[in-house]
UniProtKB/Swiss-Prot annotation:
Keywords: Cell wall biogenesis/degradation, Glycosyltransferase, Golgi apparatus, Membrane, Transferase, Transmembrane, Transmembrane helix
Keyword Secreted carried by entry: no
Species of provenance: Arabidopsis thaliana (Mouse-ear cress)
PANTHER family found in the cross-reference section: X-BOX TRANSCRIPTION FACTOR-RELATED
Source organism superkingdom: Eukaryota
EC number: 2.4.1.-
Transmembrane segments: 291-311, 322-342, 930-950, 956-976, 1002-1022, 1046-1066, 1079-1099, 1109-1129
Name of the protein described by the UniProt record: Cellulose synthase-like protein D2
Catalytic residues in the record: 422, 848
Amino acid sequence: MASNKHFDKSRSNLSNNSDIQEPGRPPAGHSVKFAQRTSSGRYINYSRDDLDSELGGQDFMSYTVHIPPTPDNQPMDPSISQKVEEQYVANSMFTGGFKSNTRAHLMHKVIETEPNHPQMAGSKGSSCAIPGCDAKVMSDERGQDLLPCECDFKICRDCFIDAVKTGGGICPGCKEPYKNTHLTDQVDENGQQRPMLPGGGGSKMERRLSMVKSTNKSALMRSQTGDFDHNRWLFETTGTYGYGNAFWTKDGDFGSGKDGDGDGDGMGMEAQDLMSRPWRPLTRKLKIPAGVISPYRLLIFIRIVVLALFLTWRVKHQNPDAVWLWGMSVVCELWFALSWLLDQLPKLCPINRATDLQVLKEKFETPTASNPTGKSDLPGFDVFVSTADPEKEPPLVTANTILSILAAEYPVEKLSCYVSDDGGALLTFEAMAEAASFANIWVPFCRKHAIEPRNPDSYFSLKRDPYKNKVKSDFVKDRRRVKREFDEFKVRVNSLPDSIRRRSDAYHAREEIKAMKMQRQNRDDEPMEPVKIPKATWMADGTHWPGTWLTSASDHAKGDHAGIIQVMLKPPSDEPLHGVSEGFLDLTDVDIRLPLLVYVSREKRPGYDHNKKAGAMNALVRASAIMSNGPFILNLDCDHYIYNSEALREGMCFMMDRGGDRLCYVQFPQRFEGIDPSDRYANHNTVFFDVNMRALDGLMGPVYVGTGCLFRRIALYGFNPPRSKDFSPSCWSCCFPRSKKKNIPEENRALRMSDYDDEEMNLSLVPKKFGNSTFLIDSIPVAEFQGRPLADHPAVKNGRPPGALTIPRELLDASTVAEAIAVISCWYEDKTEWGSRIGWIYGSVTEDVVTGYRMHNRGWKSVYCVTKRDAFRGTAPINLTDRLHQVLRWATGSVEIFFSRNNALLASSKMKILQRIAYLNVGIYPFTSIFLIVYCFLPALSLFSGQFIVQTLNVTFLVYLLIISITLCLLALLEIKWSGISLEEWWRNEQFWLIGGTSAHLAAVLQGLLKVVAGVEISFTLTSKSGGDDIDDEFADLYMVKWTSLMIPPITIIMVNLIAIAVGFSRTIYSVVPQWSKLIGGVFFSFWVLAHLYPFAKGLMGRRGRTPTIVYVWSGLVAITISLLWVAINPPAGNTEIGGNFSFP
């Protein structure tokens, strides 16, 4: 019979097989194993499972022995045991998944270099000097050893307790009695102790919430509309609760402790101070001047009227000489008018917004009676960074993005960063570890000298004076040192692929030698067989990498590997930790703490649909909810970094302002670096980000564009916004009354926080929606409460009391990370609503647009945050082929949306009509390519046939054409005026609209139809990101010509129109009765087409000056020859000769 002693919150939990129940797992009942791996990757432990496997059919029974407290066995202070356990958890790699145990592998070494920050995984620590004990000496927040004796004898926590209890309090080193035998006092003497949560006597989940569980009482507390009653979800305390929707005492003595009801923290005085202060908003809405917006709206109305009259005239006046030409042109013009209307109507209400960061600081970080140190009351922030392939997304780019996040101006203890590696590559893992190591130097340097931007690669590449406005005398010295360290950091990261390959080859050779020796020992005289050992990928500590190997093998391939979670930087302490002057930099007055950094690679197994980026994002949502549970989430692509260190605070101004609880997300504009100065292919996309998105901000808000978006976690969970009704009155309700009960499509139904009121609802429906993780389910109301605005004004509804978020965050323990492993498993989403109604929505290559649409469809609003200094910057493909494939993916997603239930025509009544039109245009715009291609060929057909779309160029046609053109130009000028874009940017957008419309959009329509009709699945390759190492030619990709079938339609249009111009010109010259009006009309429209396709033609030429002159000569000769041939074959009527006596041979 085997038995294991189980001590709560002790190191024996980490060294033995601890029976930690995982609520998020299937009924199989896996356990979390803390074990040491050998160099070959085998785990050494003696759990019941291992004994069963080794001893075969013998029956074993395990039980847990709880030893009662005795003089020799006293329970340890929970704060100390939690702190030590967090230290072990932060230095362990957790793996697990489908049909496998969750294991924590203690990482003695994460990277080849030595970590130099106490928060980093694998940081160096001294070992216990007691013979036979290999435990680590307890350390403080600075990583310094805590030694209880003046002789500096190194002893671990367990051995120190044994020496005090059984050794008479004698130091094993100097044999002198300890002056202090209390472990808590030893910690207090050497470092600061973390304050505990209120009511620390309860368990972790009991400390999270104080919930009224009576179903009868909850029925009374529920509002008449069925809205969630926010008074029930409050943090534990002995007094009454805050201001806003919570209860206040009538005499206003909350927190005064006069009658024993308050807790004496002075929060009542703070609330009175809030009421007495003049209320200041965090954001302001800046309307467009009436002198600009009024003429703009008037011109839209005039153009609509003129278009209607013009199309009516076109339909009534046919061209009997070319009815086919007239018919095609009229159909195309009707569609263009509809497309323009769908694009223009949502632009009727553009607005601008501004934030006030000073007010944010005053409200959330100003010292008060209850918060004398001015500890931040801002909510937590979880930042998601996604990467999938280190070959196409260079690790150095991702590492720079991580460094910009870690250095952001936001309370360190409130900020967490999660890196999703969907490829499970060791290269990405070690690059993130290198970034965490370099952050020890980079982040304090940024804080000390107020560096902008805080991406080191971008900062050291700035083409301006780096010493401008820097007042500290040691800045030059510090910058030089940091620059040297960054150069070494880049060398280490760029050499990681070769380092990992050499390391793996060396270990593989060693394993082969071992196997050959074993073979010789087992087979003395028998012939030797070739030794075949799978070529594994090895980590720096000499063990197998649990993710994807360089040479794919079973359980170690891109689509088949275990889930991995590694805490790269453990959670920081709650109090500032200042540096010292003796180090690399003088950091005496600089906070050297770093935010929580977690590496996550979700489990992938064959037979499970992983849903690409959307699935990776949902895995991060669940894992982060368990580990940090920040009520707000910012998602960034790996090549988009924080350019403005205050960007997070600016976004938080909107969420924390009055009415901010109804905002589902704050979208920031995308800004790009590395674009050619002329922006040949409209990569900046300023018309969309500065015109369309500002206009949507005046409605229900901008669409979600995939990156640079700050989410409210509770909105991602599929809940309705606060104070929402099932149906809002529409413009047709007066004429067609809506029935009281209506069936709503399943994907349009939203969860309500009132669904949690009934305990039976929790037990039955909630796991079916979110999965069977109780940790995840219990975190939902916590995120809802923490995400509320501050109740500092009577008009603020659904507010939270001040100071509620100044409590320290909970420490990480093994069960928490084990639960996070469970929720990123491949099977977790089975039979749940993840991806269908919760989180990022599956089923489209543009999951971002669909996810934002679902939120707006539930009644949520979003805002557009344009900061004075760009919030984020990224890279964009400047190569023509890559740009076309990017546009193809976007357009294909739009076609999928149009043929799905996410079509805006099926939107709920909660969505405004203009917002619905905007989403409808998102699904319709690729279909314009069909009519656009036809219309681009019409000028050529007109020149070839000698006819035109109208019978004659009369005054009516020309007047209509002139008015339509003038109104279009005036609208463009006014858009430029209120949006701030340039005329060149507007023209580049027009050019690429035609380039993309005649190439990528047409292919997207065909692919979308194939998927809908034939069920052909669509797959796209990942867009390659530039590593930024090509300093010789920054725009080398711009001139690279890579052939793709998407180029065929534009090339054909260019060639046909050029030939048609030559043919029409030749025919008119040699005609007896030249028809110059038809020639001018055809040539004008052909030049209109060619002018739009000029950037495309320029891209085909490659680098300037590389196209041989003979190519242009032969092109001209071929065009002239074809023109003469056409005239010879089809000469003008009544004349069989060309140019008099000259005849074509």
